[in-house]
Amino acid sequence: MVRRPCVSAAPVRVGGRLVFGFARVGSRGLCLGALLLSPRIVLAQHVADAPLGARGVVPRSSLPRRTRAARATTLRSRGGVVSSRASGGTLVVTAQKPKVMARNDVDYRPLSLQAGGRQGSLDLVATATADDASFFEANAAGSATIPRMTLAFFHTMRISDSHIDVLSFVGRAGRTGYGVSARAFYPDMSSKTTGFVGIFNVSHAFSSAYRFKGVSVGANLKVGYRHTRGGGSSQSKSSNGKENHHIVLTADVGVRGAWTVSKNFGAHEPNLWAGVAFRNIGASINATNLHGNNGAGGSGGGGGGNGDGKPAHVTDSRVILALAYQPVRYFLFGAGLEWLYNVGSIKAVNSLRYGAAFMLFPLRQLAFSSSVVMKGMGPQQVRASAGAEVQFSHVRCTASYSYLWSATPTRPHYVSIGVAGFLKPVPEQPLWQEVYRSYLRGLRHYHAQRYAEAIAEWKRTLQQGVSFEPAREGIERATKLLQLNQKVHDFNIF
């Protein structure tokens, strides 16, 4: 069989790009010429004298199978992806750029180590309640409303993976709360990541009233250290197999409001809470890179773990919104929303978590809690938790279990136990103690039908506590009854 030489080398415009097309010769083979070099290489081929094969398939090249496999392997090794398609009588072969993969996420557990307690079972809703010693990672404003000075210890275990130990102290002086917490993370295998976090907290409560219990604002300063050894898990070891040392400096800011709204049990405590928390605002410093050894990147930040060799990275941050409501003494429920983001790589780190939780109080000394939190619209992850607590006069014991379902294989079981000791109650402010005493004196006059004396006493109550609404309501009722008695007295005279 005689093969004709290539005869047509006219330029062809394909998709707005000028390339060189060559006529096909015979039923097999291509005459290839110079191609226009670009990120996408398009090879156009006229098939006027050689139509597509049977079933619309372009006949395969006559190159041996080994040669075709070797060329494909070479192209893949250079980062190219080859695809071909036949459309409109034209065979288009495309060499695409490799996709830019998202950053290699690293498990930054030393930055956000849950303490167990009520946070372990309520999860996102703990940002609204924040009423025990586990508030540090839930809402930094929690220490301003802690009723008693507390010393607590929590141990959380991810079965067959790692452990977290937490020691926390919380106190309050008037409207100002303070606390410190030390947290250590260590795995079951010594070849993986270890780390610790120290948290220093301060908060203050403003505008406390009778129904509106006020708003508290707090902040955490967090100092963390992370040590990564080569040979650990693929998500925690350095890319070069050497040790990496990371120092993390972050801050948390929290706001929490409390109200008394539509409850059927008589108590001065609030029954509606709302909280917002901004967590892990700061940077991670790769101390290994500072000494000239470029490791796996910064721990805990956008670009961390991507091997860019930068000494510092912005940490992954979170914004949490939560609401909790207790309509009756025996039941509390709430919902929360969390946005995980990174200002340095907003596209690579951008996800939502959302969930709900509830608590049951069958007895004053016993409580049960549970929550379900999902990640993504899929969802990509589902975390279900359940816990219980028993409280005595000066001690509270807690236990919780969490199951984490994920689209990727993981160790799903978490168990947490804790004990909190109440050292001494925080004394109430003398001003509010006098307000309550004055209000009670007015009630005694009211029940004795001495309405004028009750009104006078409640006016003194409002002078000491302007926002004490029961005294204002008592004055209105006593005034109406006093006017009614005066009318009855005038009627009897006539």
UniProtKB/Swiss-Prot annotation:
Keywords: Signal
Pfam families membership: UPF0164 (PF03687)
Keyword Signal annotated: yes
Signal sequence extent: 1-44
InterPro entries, A to Z: UPF0164
Family statement drawn from the similarity comment of this UniProt entry: Belongs to the UPF0164 family.
Protein name per UniProt: UPF0164 protein TP_0859/TP_0860
Taxon lineage: Bacteria, Pseudomonadati, Spirochaetota, Spirochaetia, Spirochaetales
